């Protein structure tokens, strides 16, 4: 993968290039750019599709603690590096967290948003102790003992094996001396700020996609985003889909994304 050095971080990314409008996909926690493979294949004939690995994920190392505001700055700087003035920002879960913050930071750079299984608020306090336990077990023993639980939250049954291999390879790369690569992204997730009260400042068009069986973020939280945004919002429920609906239900998600993108004004 090519690497862009921005904000003191070497960011791994992919870029289909071409002359079409740019769409930048940002992945969820514990995932990487490959979670959008089906979207890249579907959109590439008409759009310039960019994916990237965020700090502490995939091929991108974190140099220290960071927030989703830093990640928003990263995606905007990556756009600068690639000569992209304006783009649709598409994000799954934490990818949506940073995409919303990018829209707040530089509204003139964000043509539209695609928010997949995401939210604007804080983590549910009822889930926090369990997530802390999972993180600690992952640090101490690797993903093996908890990967089935994690996969069931993100993917639901039946699509686990490929991600098991990814998680174990990543852990082996960092253990035992560089496990802060796991902790810094986790703390970013758990300690993030609540931007629900600022949603009205986001006035670009938005597509909100959410799985009806999302065990990580209830659909009601996506409805809160829809209702709070200051611009036109299209809301699509993906029937039966878990947290990573673009991975498990790519046909439905791709159809909705293409319909939304094709309906945007030029520019």
Where are these regions (language model features)?
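Active-site loop/oxyanion-hole signature of alpha/beta-hydrolase fold enzymes
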Residues: 37-41, 50-90, 255
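Short beta-strand/loop motif that positions the catalytic acidic residue
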Residues: 202, 208-210
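Conserved HGGG/HGGXW glycine-rich cap/lid loop of the alpha/beta-hydrolase fold
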Residues: 9-64
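Catalytic histidine neighborhood in serine/cysteine hydrolases
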Residues: 223-244
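Acidic catalytic loop of the alpha/beta-hydrolase fold
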Residues: 213-217
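Conserved alpha/beta-hydrolase catalytic His-Asp/Glu region
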Residues: 124-129, 143-200
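Flexible "cap/lid" loop of the alpha/beta hydrolase fold
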Residues: 100, 104-105, 110-141
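Catalytic histidine-centered segment of alpha/beta-hydrolase-like enzymes
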Residues: 241-254
